[in-house]
Each structure stands twice: as C-alpha cells, then as structure tokens.
Amino acid sequence: MTNIRKTHPLFKIVSHSFIDLPAPSNISAWWNFGSLLGLCLAIQILTGLFLAMHYTSDTMTAFSSVSHICRDVNYGWLIRYMHANGASMFFICLFLHVGRGLYYGSYTYLETWNIGVILLFAVMATAFMGYVLPWGQMSFWGATVITNLLSAIPYIGTTLVEWIWGGFSVDKATLTRFFAFHFILPFIVAALIMIHLLFLHETGSNNPSGLISDSDKIPFHPYFTIKDILGALLLILILMILVLFMPDLLGDPDNYTPANPLNTPPHIKPEWYFLFAYAILRSIPNKLGGVLALIFSILILMLFPLLHMSKQRSMTFRPLSQCLFWVLVADLLALTWIGGQPVEYPFIIIGQLASILYFSIILLMIPTVSLIENKLLKW
C-alpha cells in the first residue's frame, strides 16, 4: 500500500514542502531564520488573538484595557509581553534573514526576493499599527507624526491624511480602524508567506557557496527539521529571557503614560526596529524628500538584483564585497542609534553622513567593488 503521505492531496503538499523537500547539504545556521520567522508569526497571531479577547479599541478605555490585561487577566502580563517582545524577535529574525539574502546573493531568485520585500513592508505596517493600540503617549504621537508624513504628497496629501485619521486628528476612528487592520494584516502576511515559499520551492534553496547544488541534495526531514527545532528552542529561550527578566528593555517609558493630545513628549520616536529608517527620514530637511528617502531606504532592496555586477553569486569568496557588507551593517547600527537621539548637534550631521553612506554603499560602492573583483579574478 502506497504511503498516504505521498498520495493524500493535503498531506502531499506538506510532504513536498517539509519532508521530502531536497535541500542543499551545506546550508548553514543562517538558513534557519525562515522557519524562525514562521514561528514568530505563529506566536504573534496566538498571543494577539488572546489579547484581542480583552482589549477594547476605544480612546477612553484602550489604555485601561491593556492595564487590565496585565493586572487582572490570568497570565495576561505574560501574553502581553510575549506579544510586545515577540515583535522585537520577529524583526531581529527579519533583519538577519534579509542580511543573509544580501550576503549570499539569494536575491537572484527574483520572485521570492520581491515577495519578501513586500512581506517586509506588510510586517512593518502591522507593527506600526500595533504600537498605536495601547494608546500611550508614544502610541498617540507616533501615529500622529508618521501618518502626518503623507501630507507631504502634493495636492492630495492633506485630504489623504484626514481620510486615514477618519477626522481632523488621530482619535477614536483612527484607533478603531488601526485595530481592525492590525488584526487582519498578519493573516495577509501568512498568505504572502505561502506565495514566498511557493516561489522558493520552484528553484530550491540557495547555499553558502552560491553554486548550483543539484548534485548534492539531502531530504529536509530529518536533517533540517531537527536543525530548525534547535533554532526554535534558542529563539524561545531568548524571547522568554526578555519577557520574564526585562520585558520593558526594548519599550519606551512614555508609553506607560496615557495618550494626551495636549502634551507632546520631548522626543518622539518609533520602536527600535524602525529607528534606522526614522534616522534617514530626519536627515533630510525637506518633508517630501524625507518621506521619499524613508520609502526608498526599504524599497532599495528590490534594486539589488539589478545592481549585482559580480560573476559570482555569493560573497563567500569576495573579501572586498564582504568588507563593504559589514560596513553597511555597522552603518545601519549607527542609523538605529541616531534615530533614538534628539535632533541636535552632533547627531544631525552624523545621521546625514550615515544616510549618505547607506545609499552610497548600496548604489555605488558594492557594484563598483564587484566589477573590480571580476577584474582581479581575470575572468
């Protein structure tokens, strides 16, 4: 009798995706982050569902409902902090996953890469709207500042902002719709992940050498299932250390003050994972220019396949490109730091230099160095 796993229409899909999938034998721990992102999404959807059972999306009661979850709901504090810190873990995994793709040239799988960039935007939108829901000071002012950026769009800007707000300021209508969108978006993200995997399985995974690995494939199960379980355990360990020992480490103290439209916090800043983009936005004095730079700082990822000049796919055997890659990483860390600093000397000029360096490395330096490496190889 043929194995049901290979004949049943539903089990067959699972089997082809997670059991019999031919995977390169040499993929390193950097290939673990895809499954970890799936785990993060599952944690976020589950904890979010339980939070939504007790949360009220009304300006009068939102803040106190979150307080009620933490004080009165059984293990509500645990669910709330798992959700908040789970978002941070999600973005850490996202950045490492994207970084892996850049380093090893995975962006040459065009469809997979572009869907991935769309996924990044979707997750960022979800996280932004989620940050507004507790209705603390930083929630309110963060929502006001970021949505207000759309007013930089010529002609339709102001109308667009008021349409998104559902009034003339961030208020009850804004909070209600943000809650609705925050609830639905993770499921859209899950659907996009399916498409992401569909395209990935058309080509198969890349590997650290960047070479075709058809001659040396091994089954996904048991080799990579056990490897993914190890990664998952480490992720959960780090998450639970964060949640149980330092739940507010990555949060903002201002968000423990209820939203007050009459009192602006001294330093308005988003969550830590948006700070690099926020620093790029602030480094340009012009409003529209800043918004365009902000969008392009993420959208630039889509240009990587076009800017790939090297005759090799991966950076494994390209030491000059490796140096530039790590300079880019350092630059992003510098931007993240600057994004959290007040707008004053010397932070303004550091932010501007870091922003220029960010775009220069990607648009100019990496392609140029790739061409030099081609020459050095005498190919």
UniProtKB/Swiss-Prot annotation:
Q: Which UniProt keywords apply?
A: Electron transport, Heme, Iron, Membrane, Metal-binding, Mitochondrion, Mitochondrion inner membrane, Respiratory chain, Transmembrane, Transmembrane helix, Transport, Ubiquinone
- Annotated residues for binding of a ubiquinone: 201
Q: Which Pfam families match?
A: Cytochrom_B_C, Cytochrome_B
Cofactors: heme b
Task: Tell me the membrane topology, using the record's own terms.
Answer: Multi-pass membrane protein
Q: Which GO terms describe its biological process?
A: mitochondrial electron transport, ubiquinol to cytochrome c
**Binding-site residues, heme b b562:** 83, 182
Respond yes or no to whether keyword Chloroplast is given for this record: no
Q: Give the PROSITE patterns listed for this entry.
A: CYTB_CTER, CYTB_NTER
Cofactor mode of binding and number, as noted: Binds 2 heme b groups non-covalently.
| UniProt-recorded Gene Ontology molecular function terms | metal ion binding; ubiquinol-cytochrome-c reductase activity
Q: Where does heme b b566 bind?
A: 97, 196
- State its location(s): Mitochondrion inner membrane
Q: Indicate where this protein is primarily found.
A: mitochondrion
Q: List, alphabetically, the GO terms of the cellular component aspect.
A: mitochondrial inner membrane; respiratory chain complex III
Q: What is the effect of changing residue 60 to V?
A: In strain: Isolate S104
**Segments traversing the membrane:** 33-53, 77-98, 113-133, 178-198, 226-246, 288-308, 320-340, 347-367
Additional facts recorded: Heme 1 (or BL or b562) is low-potential and absorbs at about 562 nm, and heme 2 (or BH or b566) is high-potential and absorbs at about 566 nm.
> What job does this protein perform?
Component of the ubiquinol-cytochrome c reductase complex (complex III or cytochrome b-c1 complex) that is part of the mitochondrial respiratory chain. The b-c1 complex mediates electron transfer from ubiquinol to cytochrome c. Contributes to the generation of a proton gradient across the mitochondrial membrane that is then used for ATP synthesis.
User: What is said about its interaction partners and assembly?
Assistant: The cytochrome bc1 complex contains 11 subunits: 3 respiratory subunits (MT-CYB, CYC1 and UQCRFS1), 2 core proteins (UQCRC1 and UQCRC2) and 6 low-molecular weight proteins (UQCRH/QCR6, UQCRB/QCR7, UQCRQ/QCR8, UQCR10/QCR9, UQCR11/QCR10 and a cleavage product of UQCRFS1). This cytochrome bc1 complex then forms a dimer.
Stated family: Belongs to the cytochrome b family.
Q: What's the name of the protein?
A: Cytochrome b
Organism of provenance: Notocitellus adocetus
Whichever gene encodes this chain, its name is MT-CYB
